[in-house]
């Protein structure tokens, strides 16, 4: 069976042209984002999530962003949805990705 085309994933990858270490792999019905061997992001159901710690998660919560929910019963508080304004600004998105990949 041919893989399903994912326009959102393609958009996200295009936005990361300033991050040469970026690779991605299909996983859990979405895609995992890596910088080298470091797993730092998730593309799932038309949303982008970055790895966060206690300090950086505050920045996401202040913008009313939610943690990653792979299903109705599970919440991963170590990954938060990236705000749309950041997603649309390739330079800012790269900075946020670099921070997420350094955690």
Regions found by a protein language model. Give the residues of each.
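Charge-dense, helix-prone N-terminal extensions
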Residues: 1-103
